[in-house]
Curated annotation (Swiss-Prot):
The keyword Ribosomal protein does not apply. S-adenosyl-L-methionine binds at residues 60, 89, 94, 120, 142. Belongs to the class I-like SAM-binding methyltransferase superfamily. HNMT family. This is Histamine N-methyltransferase. Monomer. SUPFAM superfamilies: S-adenosyl-L-methionine-dependent methyltransferases (SSF53335). The lineage of its organism: Eukaryota, Metazoa, Chordata, Craniata, Vertebrata. It comes from Pongo abelii (Sumatran orangutan). One of its GO terms (biological process) is histamine catabolic process.
Length: 292
């Protein structure tokens, strides 16, 4: 029975659609916006000191919504200073979406963009082959370390690219989130794939400690409304199930006992809160800021 369950990553279109539903039904981007508004200005306060150009490296920049927020904060901190913003993103579709708003945003005259259609490991290999380790003032990795095979090596490499006063920002799900409980209890019962691994801020901070890197970690509460998951035949619910379990067509292919057990657990307090008739999954995010 389990063999009929396929990884969501085996169907790119389905993955993109379920991810969109997740964004529409969660406070993920609002949570990130809050961090950018309240915390980021202090974090980037010195990254451009005495520099004629600020170099920013976005790893897994996606469609650029959060990248543009980051750029606006850097511009506000360093008005008129040239910014070199390079983006490493493996999806051509996401790069195309990123370029659209950039072309329409009027205040980006001092920002130079470059996009590289590659994974972080492909970028790492290319840079190491060139033997030109360019230093960066700000590197950010937003919700992408799940897709990296060797996370400690990736952290070590990109940390080595930080220049004077530079910072690296990583955003991942928190160890206090429902994701942590979900993956620990059910991860082995979901389809296995080599494209994604279960990692939370607890895992990352342990890796950073092992590497001897200096960092600060901030948690911000976020939720995902999964109420539709409990309505039979609801398309939104089906796609949110797929996203939660990283399974293609979970509702149609999962064994009944797994569906029943998971459906019950997801309504328990350690996974979700119930508010005004809604079931709100704990999507708390961690923002980890690493020093050069």
């Amino acid at each position: 029975m389990v063999s009929s369950m396929r990884s969501l990553f085996s169907d790119h279109g389905k993955y993109v659609e379920s991810f969109r539903r997740f964004l529409n039904h969660s406070t993920e981007h609002q949570c990130m916006q809050e961090f950018m508004d309240k915390k980021l200005p202090g974090i980037i306060a010195r990254i451009g000191d005495t520099k004629s150009e600020i170099k920013i490296l976005s790893i897994g920049g996606g469609a650029g919504e959060i990248d543009l927020q980051i750029l606006s904060k850097v511009q506000a901190q360093y008005p008129g200073v040239c910014i070199n913003n390079e983006v490493v993103e493996p999806s051509a579709e996401q790069i195309a979406k990123y370029k659209g708003p950039v072309a329409k945003t009027s205040n980006l005259e001092n920002v130079k963009f470059a996009w590289h259609k590659e994974t972080s490991s492909e970028y790492q290999s290319r840079i190491l082959e060139k033997k030109e380790l360019q230093k960066w003032d700000f590197i950010h990795m937003i919700q992408m370390l799940y897709y990296v095979k060797d996370i400690p090596a990736t952290l070590k490499f990109f940390h080595s690219l930080l220049g004077t006063n530079a910072k690296m920002l990583i955003i991942v799900v928190s160890g206090s989130s429902g994701w942590d409980k979900l993956w620990k209890k059910y991860g082995s019962r979901f389809p296995q794939n080599d494209l994604c691994q279960y990692v939370t801020s607890d895992d990352l901070t342990q890796m950073l400690d092992n590497l001897g890197l200096k960092y600060e970690c901030y948690d911000l509460f976020s939720t995902m409304d999964i109420s539709d998951c409990f309505i039979d035949g609801n398309e939104n619910g089906d796609l949110l199930w797929d996203f939660l379990t990283e399974t293609c067509n979970f509702n149609a292919t999962a064994p009944p006992d797994l569906k029943a057990e998971l459906g019950k657990d997801l309504q328990e307090p350690e996974f979700s809160a119930k508010k005004e008739g809604k079931v709100l999954f704990n999507n708390t995010l961690s923002f980890i800021v690493i020093e050069a």
